[in-house]
């Protein structure tokens, strides 16, 4: 896709808007509020936001990080989501060959971000969003010939289904083996990788391949290591680290193409 300043400016506006919208939906989900039935509002005083207060990034700065009505500090996560939204839009644009790839990758990034935020708060994710991200990846890499051969168990081809299922099986065995080693002398049942992590990594393997998914898993483990060492007795949400590792890997792919 063509690279020019106007395109990147439009992408910045689109990404920041989607980031703000994504964070709003995530916060409503975490607060058990209606997702789409209400206009945007302050989560402290519940005052509906005016149009100028909805402008991504600039409204956060002009309001001096506080609600105009109740003066309660606006969560930094809102601003961060808008900035990350711009980055997601640029990444999706630079890695896409056509509009279809751009839409798939952009939705994948934002749904993964929403899942990461929810995982941070609840250390659990909704099944609907989890399987949505898998089917987004599936629809992106879908091949009718591969699909047919996979279900008749003949002539397996190196496509989404094979890569996703092999990596899911690999993670399942790895997860249980680590749990076995960790709990060898105890009767505690603890798991290191959750089912959500396996499904998301399997979807990445289906699109980018086994090796790429393994690199993302390895990088996520490295990123989580300092937090794990610092908070040994605290249960750690791993999905945000997978998200960060995935974004880093995509940036690496962009840099590799530019060099």
What residue spans do the PLM features occupy?
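A membrane-topology feature that recognizes alpha-helical transmembrane segments
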Residues: 1-259
């Amino acid at each position: 896709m063509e690279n020019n300043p106007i395109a990147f400016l439009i992408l910045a506006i689109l990404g920041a808007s989607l980031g703000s919208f994504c964070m709003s939906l995530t916060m409503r989900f975490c607060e058990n509020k209606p997702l789409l039935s209400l206009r945007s509002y302050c989560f402290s005083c519940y005052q509906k936001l005016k149009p100028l207060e909805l402008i991504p990034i600039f409204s956060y700065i002009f309001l001096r990080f506080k609600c105009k009505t109740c003066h309660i500090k606006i969560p930094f996560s809102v601003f961060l989501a808008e900035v990350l939204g711009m980055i997601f839009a640029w990444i999706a644009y630079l890695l896409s060959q056509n509009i279809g790839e751009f839409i798939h990758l952009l939705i994948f990034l934002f749904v993964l971000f929403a899942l990461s935020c929810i995982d941070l708060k609840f250390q659990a994710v909704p099944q609907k969003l989890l399987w949505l991200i898998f089917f987004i990846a599936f629809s992106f890499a879908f091949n009718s010939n591969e699909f047919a051969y996979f279900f008749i168990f003949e002539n397996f081809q190196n496509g989404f289904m094979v890569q996703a299922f092999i990596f899911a099986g690999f993670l399942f065995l790895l997860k249980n083996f680590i749990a076995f080693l960790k709990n060898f002398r105890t009767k505690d049942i603890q798991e290191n990788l959750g089912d959500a992590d396996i499904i998301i990594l399997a979807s990445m393997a289906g699109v980018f391949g086994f090796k790429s998914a393994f690199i993302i898993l390895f990088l996520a483990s490295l990123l989580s290591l300092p937090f794990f060492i610092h908070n040994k007795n605290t249960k750690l949400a791993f999905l945000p680290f997978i998200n960060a590792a995935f974004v880093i890997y995509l940036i690496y792919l962009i840099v590799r193409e530019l060099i």
